[in-house]
Amino acid sequence: MNNNHWLERTELLIKQQGLDTLQKAHILIVGLGGVGSFAAEFIARAGVGSLTIVDGDCVSLSNINRQLPALHSTVGKNKTEVMAARLLDINPQLNLTVIHEFLTPERATEIVTPKFDYVIDCIDSITPKLNLILSAKRQRVRLVSCMGAGGATDVSQIKVADLMKTYNCPLAKFIRKRLKNERIDSGIKAVFSSEIVSKDSMQRTEGLDYKKSFYGTISFMPAAFGLHAAATAINYLLKRPATP
């Protein structure tokens, strides 16, 4: 396997054809918090050849309980910078594009193009999330959108389903409503939890970064969401019919 010897266990499972498929793929991940950072890690370790990561945030002390780039030694650093170093240490041959910015409606339209084989949405605020979903839908690029991982602790209730069939998730409820206003009522995969959210863990904010509130979060729930998102993308790529 030459320089890809580190993927020998993966090759045993998906064979050389599977490795070649993933090597040729280009995935876009937007949001590198608790969900997106783990999704990026799993994508890189699977041997995906090209990856674009987008986030405009810096590591803060409150991120340490759940986010992969967050350590006491990385507080204040750009999440994209920390994750880029980590991903390239996993796979030095990774074709990595780093975009250090928050996703505006205009940039969502510019960034999401048919060159991507899959988009993983790990944004945790409504307006940018909606813009990313709409951009992927308009460009006909496959997407999985991660809903709220906060306020829950039962990983067995994490599911992947059509967004319009999600339930018990406050974030998904808002996104469903907004998408229906855009006349979109199917065709978007979502990672969500069916667990009833712990409302007493919610805290209001000043509306910074499009957020009006957030829920308390345990270490493993965002990572589990990222795992489901990465698996959804990778399994789709491996099962997709080969193009001539």
Residue ranges: model-predicted function:
Residues 1-28, 61:
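N-terminal charged helix/coil linker that caps or initiates catalytic domains
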Residues 100-108:
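Conserved SAM/SAH-binding loop
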Residues 29-31, 54:
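Conserved N-terminal Rossmann-fold NAD(P)-binding element of oxidoreductases
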Residues 48, 53-91:
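Glycine-rich phosphate-binding loop and adjoining beta1-alpha1-beta2 segment
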Residues 2, 112-117, 123-128, 138, ...:
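Glycine-rich phosphate/adenylate-binding loop
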